[in-house]
């Protein structure tokens, strides 16, 4: 009797694990991220947000290059010394503004990326719950999957609005 119960329990455990395998799905997060980013126009939003500062930096760079060219053609004297100091100060200001611009742009890009990831994760959870899926794995993290593993990428993309 004890062996029979043990065999029945083992059979039940194997059947449960085989049944759980049916509730696994994959999703292509890279593709989703790219498509959702295009759909929402995140890159255009960021570009418009930083357009003014980028054009100011370009103007500063052009002005600085013109002054450096003028400085190279000048002979030694008080005007040259004054222009050298001006160029050095402008170069330092430009470097500081460029660094601040890059940091702000990277910070905003990360914020927008985080928002997209949150939206995608919420959609993945919603689709997984509606389709009774227990485990969703990124398709790029899977070394092999058989053809019977469900790909919910299209369903998730529809869910993300």
Curated annotation (Swiss-Prot):
Region of interest (Lipopolysaccharide binding), ranges: 97-108
UniProt subcellular location: Periplasm
Keywords, ordered alphabetically: Chaperone, Periplasm, Signal
Signal peptide as annotated in the record: 1-20
Gene3D superfamilies: Skp domain
GO CC entries: cytosol; outer membrane-bounded periplasmic space
Stored InterPro entries: Chaperone_Skp, Skp_dom_sf
Function of the molecule: Molecular chaperone that interacts specifically with outer membrane proteins, thus maintaining the solubility of early folding intermediates during passage through the periplasm. Required for the efficient release of OmpA from the inner membrane, the maintenance of its solubility in the periplasm, and, in association with lipopolysaccharide (LPS), for the efficient folding and insertion of OmpA into the outer membrane.
Domain notes: Composed of a compact central beta-barrel domain with long alpha-helical extensions that form a three-pronged structure around an internal cavity. Substrate proteins may be bound in this cavity.
Subunit structure, interactors included: Homotrimer. Interacts with OmpA. Interacts with PhoE during its translocation across the inner membrane, but, in contrast to OmpA, release of PhoE from the inner membrane is not dependent on skp. Also interacts with LamB, OmpC and OmpF.
Protein name as catalogued: Chaperone protein Skp
Gene: skp
């Amino acid at each position: 009797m004890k062996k029979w119960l043990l065999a029945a329990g083992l059979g039940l455990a194997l059947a449960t694990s085989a049944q759980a395998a049916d509730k696994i799905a994959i999703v292509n997060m890279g593709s989703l991220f790219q498509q959702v980013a295009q759909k929402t126009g995140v890159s255009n939003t960021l570009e418009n947000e930083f357009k003014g500062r980028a054009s100011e930096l370009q103007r500063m760079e052009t002005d600085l290059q013109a002054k450096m060219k003028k400085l190279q053609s000048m002979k030694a004297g008080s005007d040259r010394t004054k222009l050298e100091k001006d160029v050095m100060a402008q170069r330092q200001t430009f470097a500081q503004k460029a660094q601040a611009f890059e940091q702000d742009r990277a910070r905003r890009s990360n914020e927008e990326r985080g928002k997209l990831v949150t939206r995608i994760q919420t959609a993945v959870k919603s689709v997984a719950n509606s389709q009774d899926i227990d485990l969703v794995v990124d398709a790029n993290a899977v070394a092999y999957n058989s053809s019977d593993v469900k790909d919910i990428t299209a369903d998730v993309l529809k869910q993300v609005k």
